[in-house]
Amino acid sequence: MGKSTAGVILAKVLGYEFVDADLVIQKEEGKLLKEIIEEVGTDGFIAVENRVNSSLEVDHSIIATGGSVVYGKEAMEHLKSIGTVVYLQLPFEELNRRLSDIKGRGVVLKDGQTLKDLYEERVPLYEKYADITVNESVSYTHLTLPTTSRV
């Protein structure tokens, strides 16, 4: 289950709003993620993503961010200050399978960087910022959502 699916389900269970940060970025910039990346490059996109995520002001919401949000220290500190950061941990093989259309998905890759390189670069950052880590290689939906709804 991906971040958006998990986020929508959790939001419904908790009676919260669901916010897709990628959609917020697209709305604020008036462009698709891949268009932003094409225009300003990966570093420029990360700056935009950091700015937008640092300014999110929501209550009783589940926020699904893009994977590159972990490069923005200000965004991650802001997200941690307004809620609990959950890392949906996936083995590389599963991530590779899910991201078959990597360019169309707006994945931030530097020139010459492979998906494996990106994975190995980001995992320590996800682990650093996570308050909770959920291993997504096993489906826990039936176990975790009822427990979470009591929080």
What is each residue range found by the language model?
Residues 129-140:
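Phosphate-binding beta-loop-alpha motif at adenosine-nucleotide cofactor sites
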